[in-house]
């Protein structure tokens, strides 16, 4: 069967390519999935589209936030033919998907039929935010500063706020602060951030500072803004080189007794285990409930839904038009 896929060919260049997918002789851990929608994961994909991340070569097939229906499957796939599923794979109209033996590997989860498939493309963003929130020690009345109000930053801030914490979001892009407020975040600032944090924390620093940018200088801001015995959550993935004297940062961690927490998403089990529900399955259930109940209005995150052939302009907008561009979703139904 014919499949179309997004391919990054050079810095800032991408196009839609095609290939033939063999759909016969499926292994037990394989499935043929027809994609309906997929979301561009801006942080990860822009790092490759514009060569921010080092150590890879073009061409590259980006993407991992996919929603589609199973056409055929092997016996070990925990979903049925015809089921709507969220799965990890590069952007493509048709995918021969395979599980792996790693801690998580490629992920596939059955979606409830009342979940909007367009909104479900944001599932990975929810899973990242949920794991980050759950890794921190939270108490009622805690004050939280979330640095970076991209998609994951906004979701993380809203989740902390739902737990009853006082949360402030920080981003230099005014449009992102405005969007966060539209989605229900009470406090978001794009300038005079130190003054805002001092006012919120009575000058003592926040209990939890979250880096949702992956930018090393912002991690230093987190260390400076957190109180003594506070927590710094590294939710973004650092990719860009940054030269600095590390001693001041290490001194802050040491002198303030700060707990620094790494929050890479792929570190918890996929399935629930006896005595613990700290798993992707449980976070997936929570994310579906948040979407279903409109506790978090995912649609407001999505700037536009486009034909995948317009992929090059999509990456350009996400990189250079941050004020008006947030999440972008590909519509694959015509392919």
PLM region spans:
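Hydrophobic/small residue at the entry helix of a nucleotide-binding pocket
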Residues: 128, 152, 176
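Adenosine-nucleotide cofactor-binding segment
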Residues: 146-149, 161-221
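Glycine-rich beta-strand-centered segment in the early N-terminal region that forms part
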Residues: 23-40, 49-91
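C-terminal capping/lid region of NAD(P)-dependent oxidoreductase domains
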Residues: 203, 233, 242-243, 289, ...
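Short glycine-centered segments of the SAM/dcSAM-binding site in methyltransferase folds
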Residues: 143, 230-231, 259
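Helix-to-beta-strand junctions that scaffold the AdoMet/dcAdoMet cofactor pocket
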Residues: 226-228
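NAD(P)H dinucleotide-binding glycine-rich loop of Rossmann-like/cofactor-binding domains
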Residues: 84-147
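C-terminal substrate-binding/catalytic core of Rossmann-like NAD(P)-dependent dehydrogenases/reductases
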Residues: 247-302
């Amino acid at each position: 069967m014919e499949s179309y896929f997004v391919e990054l060919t050079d810095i800032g260049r991408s196009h839609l390519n095609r290939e033939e997918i063999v759909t016969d002789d499926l292994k037990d851990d394989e499935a043929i999935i027809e994609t309906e929608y997929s979301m561009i994961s801006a942080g990860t994909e822009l790092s490759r589209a514009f060569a921010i991340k080092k150590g890879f070569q073009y061409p590259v097939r980006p993407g991992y936030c996919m929603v589609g229906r199973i056409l055929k499957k092997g016996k070990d796939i925990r979903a049925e033919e015809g089921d709507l599923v969220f799965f990890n794979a590069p952007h493509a109209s048709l995918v021969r998907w395979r599980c792996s033996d790693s801690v998580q590997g490629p992920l596939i989860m059955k979606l409830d039929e009342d979940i909007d498939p367009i909104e479900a493309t944001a599932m990975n963003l929810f899973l990242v935010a949920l794991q980050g929130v759950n890794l921190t020690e939270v108490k009622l009345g805690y004050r939280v500063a979330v640095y970076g109000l991209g998609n994951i930053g906004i979701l993380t801030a809203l989740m902390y706020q739902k737990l009853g914490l006082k949360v402030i979001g920080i981003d230099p892009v005014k449009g992102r602060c405005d969007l966060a407020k539209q989605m229900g975040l009470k406090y978001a600032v794009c300038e005079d951030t130190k003054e805002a944090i001092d006012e919120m924390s009575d000058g003592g620093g926040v209990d939890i500072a979250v880096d949702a940018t992956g930018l090393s200088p912002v991690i230093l801001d987190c260390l400076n803004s957190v109180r003594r015995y506070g927590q710094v959550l590294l939710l973004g993935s650092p990719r860009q080189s940054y030269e600095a004297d590390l001693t001041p940062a290490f001194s802050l961690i040491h002198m303030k007794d700060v707990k620094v927490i790494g929050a890479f998403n792929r570190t918890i089990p996929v399935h629930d285990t006896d005595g613990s529900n700290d798993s992707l399955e449980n976070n997936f259930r929570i994310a579906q409930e948040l979407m279903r109940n409109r506790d978090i209005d995912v649609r407001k995150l999505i700037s536009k839904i486009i034909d995948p052939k317009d992929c090059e302009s999509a990456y350009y907008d996400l990189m250079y038009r941050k004020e008006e561009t947030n999440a972008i979703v590909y519509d694959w139904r015509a392919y």
